[in-house]
């Protein structure tokens, strides 16, 4: 079993801080109460592919919990849990994409977007509303609308900005086997 490396610990701390900043200053209200278009999830998805499920899950959990505590006075745990779930779920494909090796193919981009769409749909349309009802006794009609809006906006945001982050980063990496020894 791999141990948690110093690089992953640093990535978790910096990632959580960036998540908070993006959630605070780069979010666009949707008109649905307590629901915004969040660029932080594009960053979370990028970190998930770069560092894997544990680091990304922690970034989502810690970043969202601290953001809620700073902005609202206390975390809204049902959505904090889903942020961790989203990071963890997307991070599960990190070994299949291998972003550090460069060579981000169309197939890998499709895998990334299919995965993030499924994970976010499950998280925001199912898990978050059900936990809102169970933990906070919120009205079902309200939380399922919030969940659907969050899912749609986050899937689109990650699909556009997250994909751009992956493509841009992959261009900075040398492809495995691309260097040849001169005679």
Swiss-Prot record:
A single cellular component GO annotation: plasma membrane
Annotated membrane topology: Multi-pass membrane protein
Principal subcellular localisation of the protein: membrane
Highest taxon in the source lineage: Bacteria
Pfam families per UniProt: ECF-ribofla_trS (PF07155)
Gene3D superfamilies documented for this protein: 1.10.1760.20
Keywords: Cell membrane, Membrane, Transmembrane, Transmembrane helix
HAMAP family reported in the protein's UniProt record: UPF0397
Protein name: UPF0397 protein EAT1b_2102
């Amino acid at each position: 079993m791999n141990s948690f490396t110093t690089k992953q610990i640093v990535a978790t701390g910096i990632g959580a801080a960036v998540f908070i900043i993006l959630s605070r200053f780069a979010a666009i209200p949707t008109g649905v109460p307590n629901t915004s278009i969040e660029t932080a999830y594009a960053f979370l998805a990028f970190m998930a592919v770069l560092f894997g499920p544990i680091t990304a899950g922690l970034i989502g959990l810690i970043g969202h919990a601290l953001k809620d505590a700073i902005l609202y006075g206390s975390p809204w745990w049902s959505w904090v849990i889903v942020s961790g779930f989203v990071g963890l779920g997307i991070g599960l494909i990190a070994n299949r994409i291998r972003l550090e090796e460069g060579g981000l193919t169309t197939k890998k981009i499709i895998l990334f977007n299919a995965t993030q769409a499924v994970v976010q749909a499950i998280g925001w349309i199912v898990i978050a509303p059900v936990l809102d009802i169970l933990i906070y006794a919120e009205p079902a009609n309200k939380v399922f609308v919030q969940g659907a809006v969050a899912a749609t906006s986050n899937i689109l945001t990650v699909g556009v900005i997250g994909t751009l982050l992956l493509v841009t980063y992959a261009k900075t990496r040398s492809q495995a086997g691309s260097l040849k020894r001169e005679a």
